[in-house]
Amino acid sequence: MAMKKFVKKRKKVNFFAKNKINYIDYKDVELLKKFISGNGQILPRRITGTSPKHQRQLAVAIKRARQMALLPYVID
């Protein structure tokens, strides 16, 4: 039986805590685009590494930006 290779996973870092960002602004479109998938969906915590508090704030900011037409709902 072949041995499986062990790959050490890199610990995900909370982007907002690392950069000391307290408020996630819905008008900061470039920052919000980093947390959206290619289809336009909000990326989950397990992928981005954000804390639960910042993930909730991020989701609210992305939804506000979508309503204000700063971000698209879907990306073609």
Curated annotation (Swiss-Prot):
Similarity-based family: Belongs to the bacterial ribosomal protein bS18 family.
Superkingdom of this protein's organism: Bacteria
Keyword rRNA-binding: yes
GO biological process, one term: translation
InterPro entries: Ribosomal_bS18 (IPR001648), Ribosomal_bS18_sf (IPR036870)
Protein's name according to its UniProt entry: Small ribosomal subunit protein bS18
Subunit structure, interactors included: Part of the 30S ribosomal subunit. Forms a tight heterodimer with protein bS6.
Organism of derivation: Mesoplasma florum (strain ATCC 33453 / NBRC 100688 / NCTC 11704 / L1) (Acholeplasma florum)
GO cellular component terms given for this protein: cytosolic small ribosomal subunit
